[in-house]
Structures are given as C-alpha cells and as structure tokens.
Amino acid sequence: SSFAIEAMKDFRESFKTYPEEVSILEGSKDLRQKSRELRSYYDGPFGEEFLNRNGRKSEKINDIFNQLTPQAIRFQHSFIWDNPNPLGSKHLLNRPNQADQSDYARAHETYHPYFSSFLERFGYYDIFLVDPETGEIVYSVFKELDYATSLLDGPYADTNFGEAFRAVQGIRNSERVK
C-alpha cells in the first residue's frame, strides 16, 4: 500500500538521524549508561522469561548483546528498556517518551497504530520494515531483541530471518514481487 511505502521511507530516513536527535534531546545520558541499562533488561526480564519457558538460560544472550551496534543500543533502550509496558507488551507503546521529539518518534506515533491494528486483524507474528540496503530492522510492531539490528551482519544475520532477507535482497529487479 502507499501508506506502507511512505512509512518505510519515513522510518528509513529517521532511523539514520535518530542517534543525533536523541543525543541532543537527552544530553547527559551517554551510550555507556544506556548500554548498562539495556543489559539489565537482557539479563533481567528477558533472561528470566527465557529461563521460565526453556528451563535454561540462553547461551547466546551474551553474543547477541555484544553484537549490538550503538544505533541498536539507542533504539532498544528507548523502545524496549525505557518502555513502561512489560515484556510481551512492548507493542503497546506509541511514542517512546513525551520529551522525544525526534522524527523517528513522530513517525512511530503516526504509523505504529496502523501496523499494530493490521497485525491483530490478520494474526501476524510481527510486522517488520527492513532497510533493503543495510538490512537494519528500522521498525517492528513487537520490538523484540532483533529490533534495530542488521540482518546482514548483526546478531540475527545467521538466522532463518537473515537468510530470508538475503534471499529476497538477491532477487533481480525484473523478478521483484510487486
């Protein structure tokens, strides 16, 4: 749909400028602090839920966290760690923080209700918007740990999701799905 195309354009562009916009708005909270706080989510709520569901700790959680880019840390911090909704309900957040006046926050507030409604209506697991050049997940309804990572060289590059992305990326223009 033209709505989804516009959303992709807006998310893709604002994804690139978000770090600068957020640093200006937040001032003192540096990347190291955000990284520590986000790590507490990986080890805490996420790690505990993983243990409850699987009877063991995730062996890959350190590898996943250590492969996060500064960009991914900023996005996951804003939309996962600093999200007041509990694990499994992160999708209920429309705007990360009322003080966040970034282009990305405005795009999220505009498009997220539409994608959330579409997901619920059709029963999808999640809806992702992925930058076709960088492989970065620039938007996700559910904001799980793959959010804001690259499917080309990030922690999920060697998953089925990463493989599917690369397969689609390799399709020639004449063969593209319309």
Can you say where each PLM-predicted feature lies in the sequence?
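Extracytoplasmic/periplasmic ligand-binding sensor regions of membrane-associated signaling proteins
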Residues: 76, 81-89, 93-178
